């Protein structure tokens, strides 16, 4: 787009913009989207960063909008516990949480219930209820060969999640006609067009 307007920009400049501004946009997006009451779908995806496997914990609501993401080096109960606690702090308690049959997610959920969080929440592990989030992982698995460090992978994924979230929200509301990423970012940042 910039080249079409006569502006010559190196690809490393665009990469630096993504690394710097994607975090800001992600946190603004999270501030504006703080409601999810009915059901959450949670899963983890494997992402290779510099030849080593890392784990991307993701949670979406019943409409498919991303609630939160968290990139971790380990896939264990402690990481799942911290992610569930973080979700509870931001969104409160849903009616149901749908996960796969991963032992770490189940034990973390039981541990949080014993502490007093999620007392009324139902934990479902039915295989086909989690299809929505499994399909939602695709873009991150496709781009895994480009990630060179945990920090850059995290900020790149946050930027991708923000743009996908804006697109999904407009698609769900039926306002995709005339959709513009730049207009949505201006609205997100409170800048008048």
PLM regions and their residue ranges:
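Residue-level recognition of single "structural anchor" positions
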Residues: 1-193
């Amino acid at each position: 787009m910039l080249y079409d307007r006569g502006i010559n920009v190196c690809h490393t400049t665009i990469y630096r913009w993504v690394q710097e501004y994607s975090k800001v946009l992600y946190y603004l997006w999270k501030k504006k989207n703080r409601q999810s009451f009915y059901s959450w779908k949670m899963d983890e995806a494997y992402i290779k960063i510099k030849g080593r496997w890392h784990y991307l914990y993701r949670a979406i609501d019943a409409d498919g909008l991303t609630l939160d993401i968290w990139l971790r080096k380990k896939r264990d109960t402690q990481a799942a516990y911290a992610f569930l606690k973080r979700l509870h702090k931001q969104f409160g308690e849903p009616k149901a949480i749908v996960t796969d049959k991963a032992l770490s997610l189940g034990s973390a959920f039981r541990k949080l219930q014993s502490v007093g969080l999620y007392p009324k929440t139902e934990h479902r592990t039915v295989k086909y209820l989690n299809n929505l989030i499994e399909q939602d992982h695709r873009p991150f698995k496709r781009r895994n060969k480009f990630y060179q460090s945990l920090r850059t992978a995290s900020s790149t994924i946050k930027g991708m999640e923000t743009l996908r979230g804006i697109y999904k929200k407009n698609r769900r509301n039926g306002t995709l006609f005339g959709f513009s990423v730049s207009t949505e970012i201006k609205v997100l940042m409170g800048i008048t067009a």
